Structures are given as structure tokens and as C-alpha cells.
Amino acid sequence: MELTRVQTDALVIGGGLAGLSAALELRARGWDVTIVSKGKVGQSGNTIMTRNSMAAVLVEAPTSGTVIEHVQDTLVGGAYLNDRELVRKLAAKAEEGIKSLERWGVPFLRQDGRISSKGSPGHGRERIVTVDARHLRSTHNAGLALSLPLLEKAKEAGVTLLNGILITGLLKQDGTVGGAYGLDRSKPQAWVFESRVVILASGGVGKLYPLTTNAGDVSGDGYALGYLAGAKVRDMEFIQFHPTVSMVASKEVLSTAPLSAGAVLRNKLGDAFMTRYSPEGDMATRDVMARAVYEEIKSGRGSDNGGVYVDYSQVSPAKMAKEYEPIQRRLNGRSTIEVGTAAHFMMGGIVIDEFGRTGVPGLYACGEVTGGVHGANRLAGNALTEAVVFGIEAGRHAGSSRDPGASVPSTLKFTEIEQLLAQDGIYLRHDLPRVAEGNDVQAEPSLDGIKREMRSLMGLNVGIVRSGPGLWHTKEKLGQFQTYLQTYPCRRYSELLALSQLKLMILTALLITEAAWERQESLGAHYRVD
């Protein structure tokens, strides 16, 4: 198998908003920066799938309120489980993050020359601003209006961009992270990266579940990578399920913002049911909405397709055209859209401080892969704000911590790299270890079969509603999968690639399930029926 070694000042794992923001900050400080992505930098992952909404208090938007109000709403939404220092940083630096994005070429919707702001459930003031994606043909990948300008800026700045690489482990010597290693997704090739700093910005966990709003390459790798390197994780039991996902094939996420402007959730009987579940009615937070939708469907009041409806008839046509034009286009003259729930966002993750430091020397993290900002539930708009704010903070602090310029010392000999990779089943001198004659590997569970069963277990037992017996059963099965995969006999490179990916997925799924098992009370997005 071919081996490629890369030396760089900073290695950023993940090519979405958080990773690109960190990379641009590092380049501004003269650092040699490499972004490695499982998909295409700036053109894959969850950033391109977003609705482009960001929560920020802006001087030019008086109705957005104050930073203190933003902090308070975020704490209330997160059931006060949030890290308050991180929340304060999020709210205080949100405007700077928006201005940085504008400086990097990202357009925002404006009115009378000012950035427009609107309300959303969970927010007491109108602090949701939106990236202008009207120039894009499709609303399904509207986040490209956010990521493509940053991608072009990164290219102009001289950031090295490497696509199609699955990172399978972090390099760690004497307690310090100094790089990473992984596999090429298109050909039999191993990669080893040696760097002064590693920044994890690898996104969420959506593909651990059978139904998700997330992109196809978002499978929770970073949580496992950080954990294996010694980073702590927190709040892993809190998975947000989006309550308004279109039931058509595209599974497009529909903004909940119109619910603050008169839109109403209805069941198949036409009942506006949210008042049965929350005094806030249709202004309730997403965790409450998702459970309400789940209960309506479970009680037989869901649509034939297993969903409910958003009724937009009470939102004025002028407001729909001005603020919710993508939804108006999808309505196409109708007043309702059929929606359901799907795994959407991970509130928990790697523990960081306000500068993105993980506590492991040499390792930073930012964006959805981290925990602490959102607590038990995330408010709309805070995800993208978190990504840019803490991407900038991680890049800024890492870039100020050590002097760039000198080449990264090559400390690993080839034989050491060979031994390190072999621990993960990656063999450089020959393709793969031979399967013993007569060993019928076909009779064993397949990797695809294990992945399907894992997703089914996560959806059934670690989803919107959970129970002790279901969580224990899932813990046991995931542990069995983990043991089995340690000696799985790969026969070809494609199997090695799939196995390496699945090991990371199983570990992250286990971290989620164990956290859900340990928290016996219901809180935020974690709901125990027992």
C-alpha cells in the first residue's frame, strides 16, 4: 500500500464552516495550514445542508436585543446544563463572527442597507440573521452560499486542501498530539500527517441514525478520534431531532422560524396539537416539538406517511415572500407541508475551553464536534454561530501559541509509522493479511449488516424516546460489535476502509448510549419513559 507523508504547521480535520474559519485565522498569522476532509472541503458535510440561519445580537439590528438576553435564552433552552463561559463567548463574539464572514465574502439578507433579523422559537428577541442564498438554484444545498466564499478565500490564502481522506487516528507522542493518520477513500493509500497543532472540526453524528437531516459523510468520527487521544466528552446523550423535516424524498429541513410568525403544527385531524405539550405552544423548543410529533404519530394521529403538517395559512403572503421564500416556493400555492422528525444535531461532544483547547496538548476542537455551548437542547441559529465563533477562537489561539515558519520536525521513522498503522489493520508492505484457508468469512456478520443493525438500534432505543431496557440492550450489542470488529478479517482495501469507518461509528454510538444510560432523569432532548 502506498504511503504519503505530509508535514504542516496546523492540520484541520473537517472542511465545513468551523474548519474553514479556523484555517483562515491560522493563515492570517502566517501558519502553513492543511485541511483534510472526508468529502470535498467546502462542498460536503452539514454546512452545505443548513438553512443559513445564525443567531447574533447586532448593533445595526435593534430588535435583536442584548448579549445578556442571548445568553439567557441559550441557557434556558439548554436547561442550564450549558458551560456558561462558552455561552458568554458565543453571544459576545457572534457579531464579530458575522462581520468576519462578510469580510470573507459571505452575503447576508439585508433591508434598507442593514442586515435583516427575525424571530425563532426559543429566542425572546429577533436575532436570527440569514445568509443570502437566492443566487443558488437549489434550496437543498443552500449552505453553499456560506461555504463557497470561505472555500475561495482559503484557496486565495494558500491553505492546502485535501479531499477524500478518512482520518482513522491521531498521532500522540509523550502526551502531545502532533498529527493524524488515515486512508484514502478512492485508492489503496495511507496518509500520515505530522503537525504542530491539530484542530478537530469534523461535525456531528447524523449517520449513526436511520433517519437524519445530515449529509452522508457525517458519521461521528471526531468524537471517537478525540476520545481515543485522551480528550474528555460531555453531554453525549443529548441528540436533537428536528421536528420539521419534509417527508418527500429529499428530506429537506424546513425552518421552524415561521412558527414564530403564525404557522401552526397540525395532526391529520387538523388539530393544532402543540398546546397539549407545552404552554408555549408552537413557540416551544425543538426537543419538545419533536416529542410532540412523536406522540401524535404514536397515538395514531399522524399522516399516512408517518408525519404531521405545518400549516402556513396564518402567515401573511408578504411575510412569506420576504422572509421564507424557499418555503413559499415549496408550498406552490398550498397552505401545508407534511413533515416528520429526523436526527439533526449533537449537543454534546468534546470538552473545550473558550479558546477551543481540549486539555490534550496540541489538540483543539470547534463546531458541532464539541460540547458545552448548547447544554440539553440547542436553539435555532446557534449552531452556525458556534461554528464560526469557536472556529475563529481555536485558529486564533492556536496561531498565537507557537511560532510558525520553521518546518515541522519529522520525528517518526518509517518503521514506527508502519507499526502504528498496523495496530489499525493498515499494512504498508503488503495489501492485507491473508484469511486462513477454510475460514468462511461470508458466514460471519457483514460490515454493512452491522452498520444497518447499529443504526436500527440507535433509532429504536437511543432516539427521541428512551428506556432503561432498550439502552442496556443497545449497550450490550454495540459492545459485541466492537469486540467482533477487532479481529474482522479484511480481504480487500474497500473492506479495510469500511471497517475503519465502522469502528469509529461504533465507538461514538457507544459513548452516546452509555451517557443516555447513565442519565436516568429526563432532561432537554434526553427523554426517558422510565
Segments the model singles out, each with a brief description of its role:
Residues 197-252, 377, 381-397:
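Glycine-rich loop(s) and the adjacent beta-strand/alpha-helix scaffold that form part
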Residues 225, 231-335, 388, 397-404:
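An anion/pyrophosphate-binding glycine-rich loop and adjacent beta-alpha core
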Residues 28-48:
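Glycine-rich FAD pyrophosphate-binding loop
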Residues 1, 5-6, 25, 40-42, ...:
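Glycine- and aromatic-enriched mobile tails/lids
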Residues 5-8, 187-197, 359:
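Core beta-strand elements of the Rossmann-like FAD/NAD(P) dinucleotide-binding domain
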Residues 10-35:
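N-terminal Rossmann-like FAD-binding beta1-loop-alpha1 element of flavoenzymes
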Residues 43, 97, 102-189, 201, ...:
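Conserved redox-cofactor binding core of oxidoreductases
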Residues 55-90:
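Glycine-rich active-site loop/strand segments that organize a redox cofactor
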